[in-house]
Amino acid sequence: PYPRNNFNTELIQLCMNGEHFSLLIEISPIRSKKNIMALKEYLVDGYSKQESCERNNVSISYFCLCLKKLNYTHSIVSALKYFYRE
């Protein structure tokens, strides 16, 4: 069996680079360019949630929803990596 606790992983601000972020966005359900930019500024560039939302004209509530979706995508990828070990 695979470790189910991977579903509780959470993205941490400044702990990913642009390529990692882009790959997660590619397989996530998030499509809004403004939200993607706000998420990138928050997770990769280190802006606060408030700053990222203001700079990209995104509501904080929708930003948080998108962050939750991206966290879910990240947790699924974390669980899947178990099946791709050599």
Give the predicted meaning of each segment:
Residues 12-34:
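Short, Lys/Arg-enriched anionic-surface-contact patches
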Residues 32-47:
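Short, amphipathic alpha-helical "recognition" segments used to contact nucleic acids or chromatin
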Residues 73-86:
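Short Lys/Arg-enriched helix C-cap and helix-to-coil transition segments
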Residues 66-67, 74:
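DNA major-groove recognition helix of helix-turn-helix
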Residues 1-11:
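General nucleic-acid-binding
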Residues 51-59:
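Short alpha-helical "recognition helix" segments of helix-turn-helix
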